[in-house]
Amino acid sequence: VKLVRTRSEAKSLVTTAFGKGFPNYDPTNRLKESWRKFSFSRDGFVDMAKAIARYVYPPNYVKIMGKEVGYAYFQNFIPNNESDTRIIVIDGKAFGLLRYVRKGDFRASGSGSFAYEREHFDERCVSIAFEITEKLSMQCVAFDFVFDAANQPLIVEISYGFSAPGYDPCPGYWTPDLEWHEGPFNPQGWMVDLVIKQTTNDSNLHNH
């Protein structure tokens, strides 16, 4: 993800996208990001050491992954957001976190700075997430929201997966009626239950 400020920058990115492409793994960027986290918290020493090692010896999967080539996506930049809102929906249940923007950057992804308490969330995001999940018949999906100048929620990204440990501190979840259910939960278990339920339904249809 890059912030494009000029027409010439956009043309350069398009030329690369439809030319040699972009590597899936950028060791220089990984090293910079690991240093940023290490500077923020000394707990990142192991990650920093791994980044240095991978800068010198790129992991084997880099060759397998290849490059991102043949496409380029652009969207309007929405300024003045100190965080984004990540809402995950699985089988009629939603949970989320706020990801604060990195210092000196515009991106929230990878910042490592989160908020989980219910009062931090605009429940319009939750409602929109449920609505779209139902319309598109999605099983597990993550939505990233920001807010425009009129304080209207906008979806900037949709993902099919998420890093599970980052959501362990979530204090509860919503159901489609926006009722809040306080307490620990197991989203991975929800996925298993959903697959079993859908497989059973498909089996029953075939039997009839």
Predicted regions and their residues:
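Active-site nucleotide/adenylate-binding loops and adjacent lid/helix of ATP-dependent enzymes
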Residues: 1-71, 123-126
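Short flexible/disordered coil segments
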Residues: 28-30, 54-65, 136-142, 156-163, ...
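Short acidic/polar alpha-helix capping motifs at helix-coil junctions
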Residues: 37-38, 46-50, 94-95, 106-110, ...
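Phosphate-binding core of ATP-grasp and ATP-grasp-like enzymes
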Residues: 17-25, 68-111, 127-141, 147-153, ...
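Short, glycine/charged-enriched secondary-structure capping and boundary segments
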Residues: 4-5, 89, 171
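Short hydrophobic/aromatic-rich motifs at helix boundaries and adjacent loops
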Residues: 43-46, 56-57, 99-103, 114-115
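C-terminal active-site "lid" helix and adjoining low-complexity regulatory extension at the edge
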Residues: 114-120, 138, 147-208
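Solvent-exposed, charged interface segments at domain starts and junctions
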Residues: 1-3, 59-85, 202-208
